[in-house]
Amino acid sequence: MKVLFAITEAEPFVKTGGLGEVGRYLPLALQEQGVEIRVILPQYSSIPRNYLQKMKTIKEFTVPLAWRNQYCGLKELKYEGIHYYFLDNEYYFRRSRCYGDGDEGEQYAYFSRAVLESVRYLPEFKPDIIHCHDWHTALVPLFLKAFYAQDTLYYNIKTLFTIHNLKYQGIFPREVREDVLGLSGELSSSAQLEFYGGVNFMKAGIMHSDQVTTVSPTYAREIQHPYFGEGLHGVIQGRKDSLLGILNGVPRPWPSPTLADKRANRMKLQEQLNFTNNEEIPILSMISRLVEQKGLDLLLHVLDEILALDIRLVVLGTGDAHYEERLQRFAEGYPGKLRVILGYQEELAHRIYAGADIFLMPSRFEPCGIAQMIAMSYGTIPIVRETGGLKDTVRPYSPISGEGNGFTFTDYNAHELLYAIQKAVEMFRNQKDTWQKLQENALSSDFSWNRSAARYRDVYESLYYSS
């Protein structure tokens, strides 16, 4: 069973967010599960030079895109035992950023078409399944039907489309349909692509793939309803029998942290943040984009009350200016209790994950979320809102059964967040044995990529044998 993994990011070549981790770690885990997998992505100019220099050119060809015929260079690099293919076109990918340019629709329509054209030239590899990720590759299933249905090379190729975040759909003016996509006939109809007068790439991926997955079971249920469906809930309801939720994983820290490590990490963090060295004062943390989706409104609404508790809080992240400014003003008003560090530093982030006692993630919605899983892998206890992958990964602690690995609250309400924090702080300070049991539960939680890969392998096999 051969799988071509079409994605726009893969660490260490390019990473702007969690998708880059998926592009690296899921293929590795799938290969361990016996899947013959290869990854294909754009050759961005931002890829580090040491990797660019090691790439081998396989083929140069042209990619049809409506009235255009665009150059494509197909290159290969083997990394960590995985074959990575890179699609080279300086016009589309020699840019200062991966996303956000004005011709993004054309840029990623080209990438989707180039993925399919490259199948002709992959050495000794004809995929049984093409696994597409988010709107940037969502046209692959549609193009496969529109332009390759009569080509015997493409017979029996199945497509799997994974939604990582439904909020970002790739919506463009209606002119894109003919001028960029080159579609006509039934597959160009409004039912296939149209979205309030525009063209919606994500909609095409959902409608035309053989199977749809998203990144947690709860999110798969949520997006079938208007509040979470971002205007596509009706389309998703129409595919509900082909929709599955599979949690992402996180790389396990090595060596696996212990509670003894936790104490040492806590001391290092206190020293770095200039917090008083006091084991009785819990360190709360938040590592996040500072945007409304992540629950910043809830946090700020009750931040005075949180800081009135005998706690310390560190916030690391960057985002909307008004959230940054308000957090900085709070930090000035609570010196020694609140540290706000704007920006993102990988090393500091992992020191916070490892050294803090409590991790806050009060998101309005969260397709999967990886921060809470990273925190638990270090024995840091999450407080989360019950939504998406947060609900699937964080189980509220039960003092009766001794089961559970964190604290949760249901409604998007600031005082529910405050109550959960008060409850956690009280347990930390007054129920030491219970807190230690909670930490042990968090440390033993399985969020490995191997678990995710086993589920995807089952999906691949189902598609493969349905031919």
From Swiss-Prot:
Keywords: Glycogen biosynthesis, Glycosyltransferase, Transferase. It catalyses: [(1->4)-alpha-D-glucosyl](n) + ADP-alpha-D-glucose = [(1->4)-alpha-D-glucosyl](n+1) + ADP + H(+). InterPro entries: Glyco_trans_1, GS/SS, Starch_synth_cat_dom. Gene3D superfamilies: Glycogen Phosphorylase B. Pathway: Glycan biosynthesis; glycogen biosynthesis. GO terms for molecular function: alpha-1,4-glucan glucosyltransferase (ADP-glucose donor) activity; alpha-1,4-glucan glucosyltransferase (UDP-glucose donor) activity. The keyword S-adenosyl-L-methionine does not apply. GO terms for biological process: glycogen biosynthetic process. NCBIfam families: glgA, PRK00654.1-1. Belongs to the glycosyltransferase 1 family. Bacterial/plant glycogen synthase subfamily. HAMAP family: Glycogen_synth (MF_00484). This is Glycogen synthase. The lineage of its organism: Bacteria, Bacillati, Bacillota, Clostridia, Eubacteriales.
